[in-house]
């Protein structure tokens, strides 16, 4: 491999762009993966995700082993050392190879004069590893979450916060959604077994299958033909609660990348679906999903706060509002969220959610259903949000999900279950 495409240096650059520049890993990683051989793409992804998952531990180690931080143009070296720590702690990369490749990464980022420093810090860590890890185990950094988020989780879930944090720090399972217009779930599970893989049905969501071992999509029976879609079990709950029917006019708001749009159409193939999202670029994913599954929907770019701009005075039988949120329920799937979010974001997001709810409620027909959903675990975005909405909206009533005091259903992330998700099903009187 060319030195400028040193895997460790690319991982360091990716993490730096996330932490220092506030970019999401899903935007940063794909262009960097184009620079490495196919056989190395999985390792590059593992290094990026792993460093972001354990960032507070790696930062703590650097502070212990270095007298002053790397700044300015040398900042990438800070993250390169983190990549070295991560390999030594969490991967099967032989220690000598981890050291050699990480040190060589300094050349790729044009800092060859710092090879000795990187080598020295990593070797010092190896010598002191047991002592350092024992000390780390009693530090605040051990939770691998920013302090503000730990406090919010402790306040919201006094008996469950550690469970949530532990779940967030795990690798996520791979959930699939079987397209019921092509196969029954049991029928597709048989095809999966014929392909040498094993899957397990979800007890509550009728299309959901968890793979025993994650697999590339091209290995899944009928993926290209639209027989199956990658979608977390909890995300599949949205269409289950919405219960769309053929012939209905349905709005899927904040629809990108289209997983829920296509699920609605699998459940009700004759429904008239309008999929709206504010992000023009992400709408391309909606088109891609519709095309792969051979489905049709009207797709528009628009801001949920101003429905007259994208649907005139049209009203809908059902509305799915998958509201913009902190995404604190999907941290195990997107560990960069921990470092991209700020405490102040929560109040701003809650205000935006309230504005969208108030704007789209008049577009729901009397007797119609609105499902409000987030991939958050924070009450400000979920139960508190719906409680306030019910208080100010006399023609809204809760259905199926929770009680007026505790409205909605909150799923927490964990183990082999789905991601953290919240749903509230509202009926217009």
Swiss-Prot record:
GO molecular function, one term: rRNA (cytosine-C5-)-methyltransferase activity
Entry keyword rRNA processing: yes
Record keywords: Cytoplasm, Methyltransferase, RNA-binding, rRNA processing, S-adenosyl-L-methionine, Transferase
InterPro entries: MeTrfase_RsmB-F_NOP2_cat (IPR049560), MeTrfase_RsmB-F_NOP2_dom (IPR001678), NusB-like_sf (IPR035926), NusB_RsmB_TIM44 (IPR006027), RCMT (IPR023267), rRNA_ssu_MeTfrase_B (IPR004573), rRNA_ssu_MeTfrase_B_ent (IPR023541), RsmB-like_ferredoxin (IPR054728)
Origin species: Salmonella newport (strain SL254)
Subcellular location: Cytoplasm
The EC number(s) this enzyme carries: 2.1.1.176
Record's catalysed reaction(s): cytidine(967) in 16S rRNA + S-adenosyl-L-methionine = 5-methylcytidine(967) in 16S rRNA + S-adenosyl-L-homocysteine + H(+)
Compositionally biased residues, Polar residues: 400-412
Gene3D superfamilies reported for this sequence: Helix hairpin bin, NusB-like, Sun protein, domain 3, Vaccinia Virus protein VP39
Stated family: Belongs to the class I-like SAM-binding methyltransferase superfamily. RsmB/NOP family.
GO CC field: cytosol
NCBIfam families membership: PRK10901.1 (NF008149), PRK14902.1 (NF011494), rsmB (TIGR00563)
Gene Ontology biological process: regulation of DNA-templated transcription; rRNA base methylation
Pfam families cross-referenced by the UniProt entry: Methyltr_RsmB-F, NusB, RsmF-B_ferredox
Catalytic center residues: 375 (nucleophile)
Protein name: Ribosomal RNA small subunit methyltransferase B
């Amino acid at each position: 491999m060319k030195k400028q495409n040193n895997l460790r240096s690319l991982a360091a650059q990716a993490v730096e762009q996330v932490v220092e520049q506030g970019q999401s890993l899903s935007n940063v990683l794909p262009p960097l993966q184009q620079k490495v051989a196919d056989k190395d793409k999985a390792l590059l992804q593992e290094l990026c995700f792993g460093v972001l998952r354990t960032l507070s531990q790696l930062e703590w180690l650097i502070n212990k082993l270095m007298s002053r931080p790397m700044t300015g143009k040398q900042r990438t070296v800070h993250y390169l050392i983190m990549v070295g720590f991560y390999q030594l702690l969490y991967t099967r990369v032989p220690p000598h190879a981890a050291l050699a490749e990480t040190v060589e990464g300094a050349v790729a980022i044009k800092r060859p004069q710092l090879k000795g420093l990187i080598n020295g810090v990593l070797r010092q860590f190896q010598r002191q590893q047991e002592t350092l890890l024992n000390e780390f185990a009693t530090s605040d950094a051990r939770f691998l979450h920013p302090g503000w988020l730990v406090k919010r989780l402790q306040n919201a879930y006094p008996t469950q916060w550690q469970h949530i944090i532990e779940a967030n720090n795990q690798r996520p399972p791979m959930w699939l959604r079987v397209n019921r217009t092509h196969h029954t779930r049991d029928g597709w599970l048989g095809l999966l077994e014929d392909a040498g893989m094993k899957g397990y049905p979800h007890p509550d969501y009728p299309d959901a299958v968890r793979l025993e071992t994650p697999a590339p999509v091209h290995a899944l029976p009928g993926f290209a033909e639209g027989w199956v879609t990658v979608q977390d079990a909890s995300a599949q709950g949205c269409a289950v609660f919405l219960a769309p029917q053929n012939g209905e006019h349905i709005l899927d708001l904040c629809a990108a990348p289209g997983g829920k749009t296509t699920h609605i159409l699998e459940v009700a193939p004759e429904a008239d679906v309008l999929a709206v999202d504010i992000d023009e670029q992400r709408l391309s994913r909606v088109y891609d999903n519709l095309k792969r599954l051979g489905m049709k929907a009207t797709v528009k770019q628009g801001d949920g706060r101003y429905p007259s701009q994208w649907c005139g005075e049209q009203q809908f039988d059902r509305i799915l509002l998958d509201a913009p949120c902190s995404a604190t329920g999907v941290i195990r799937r997107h560990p960069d969220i921990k470092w991209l979010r700020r405490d102040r974001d929560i109040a701003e997001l809650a205000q935006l959610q309230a504005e969208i709810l108030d704007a789209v409620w008049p577009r729901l027909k009397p007797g119609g259903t609105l499902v409000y959903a987030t991939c958050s675990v924070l009450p400000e975005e979920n139960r508190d949000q719906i409680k306030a909405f019910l208080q100010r909206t006399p023609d809204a009533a809760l259905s199926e999900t929770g009680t007026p005091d505790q409205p909605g259903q909150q799923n927490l992330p964990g183990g082999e279950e789905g991601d953290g998700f919240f749903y509230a099903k509202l009926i217009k009187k």
